[in-house]
Every structure is written in C-alpha cells, then in structure tokens.
Amino acid sequence: METRLNLLCEAGVIDKDICKGMMQVVNVLETECHLPVRSEQGTMAMTHMASALMRSRRGEEIEPLDNELLAELAQSSHWQAVVQLHQVLLKEFALEVNPCEEGYLLANLYGLWMAANEEV
C-alpha cells in the first residue's frame, strides 16, 4: 500500500501532504479498526480516497453517488460507526472534501467495514 501511495505521489497524482495523510489513514484502518486495507478492495478504496482528496483540492467535481444507493447503505446498523470513522479520517487533511466525493468515500469505507465483519 505504501509503495502505491508513494508512486502516486512521485507521479504527481497526489501531493506529498496527502500521501503522508493517507499513510496515517492506512495505519488507523489497519491497526486500530482491523479493516482489510491491504486487500484488492482496500487498495482501491485508499487509491480512490487519495484521488478524491486531490480532486477536492483542485476544485474538480465528479457526479455524486446515487442517492438511492446511499440511502440503502444508511439503513445499515453499522452506518453511524462508518460515518464517524470517515469524519475522524478526514481530520488528517487540511482541506474540505467536495460533497460530491462524500458518498463514494463512505461507500468504500462501508465496503471495507463489511468485508472485515465477514472475515470474523
């Protein structure tokens, strides 16, 4: 995971501060939350988060996640914990995430949360 983030940084896809913050995110998710960040799904989620942070910094907008899908995810008993974790992770970064990115970030984090619970 660290290699991938460093490659994104070296290629200019993400800034150094975002790379450093993402290393912190990976550490928190792996050691404190026991989420499978080193899986294919985890790699995709971390890459997307880093890219979303850069898009937000650059003022680039994407289409938001479908509201119906987000509403369906929000019905989960785990949703509040996922939202709280999401907010904690974003505190690592000195930027405001574009609201269009929020749904995707939450969905990816939810997916990791559910994958971890399936493994138990």
From Swiss-Prot:
PRD domain ranges (all copies): 13-119
GO BP annotation list: regulation of DNA-templated transcription
InterPro entries, A to Z: PRD (IPR011608), PRD_sf (IPR036634)
PROSITE patterns in the cross-refs: PRD_2
The protein's name: Uncharacterized protein YhfY
Underlying gene: yhfY
